[in-house]
Amino acid sequence: MPYDPDIHHRRSIRLKDYDYSLRGLYFVTICTHGHILRFGDVVEDAMILNSAGQMIERWYKECERHFDNLRCLDYVVMPNHFHCIFQIVETASPKERQQVPLVGADLCVCPKTPASSLGGHAGPPLHTIIQWFKTMTTNDYIRGVKNGVFPPFHVRLWQRNYYEHVIRSQHSYDEIVEYIRNNPKQWYNDKLFHP
């Protein structure tokens, strides 16, 4: 059935009028379709990646090479989801990008005016980065299925959407980093845990 806005009341979870290509820090969560466990196991409060989880990790690190305006910060691959912090920076040389501070002026604050009047675009918006990451990981996973390395998936590898949070302060950044680092320890209490 084709999309019909009168029937399919799909509500956007993005900030209205926010320009997701602006430089700043973004906390992102991407879940597997159906929350199926695909990327490894949590053993004694530590995430043990299987070959599919290692592939996800590899493609996350590859994002920086593909997008000049991107830094990949803290992340964790979990059995059925992936958390990370992307930093969109001004387009610069790799050496200049390494010198960009993590917080302070680069923290992204929600605009009070429509995005079109703000300027300051750094490059591709967040959704383009996520789409590329999902495409690369899905294609690699499909190759693994064809080679008998990964189990097949039904419909798609990832959920259609993703969750994002614009990081607006040092305190928020610190809390999110701690959340990411402690995620394996909290696995059995996680709402995404489905044995």
Predicted feature residues:
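Short catalytic/metal-binding and nucleic-acid-binding patches
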Residues: 1-195
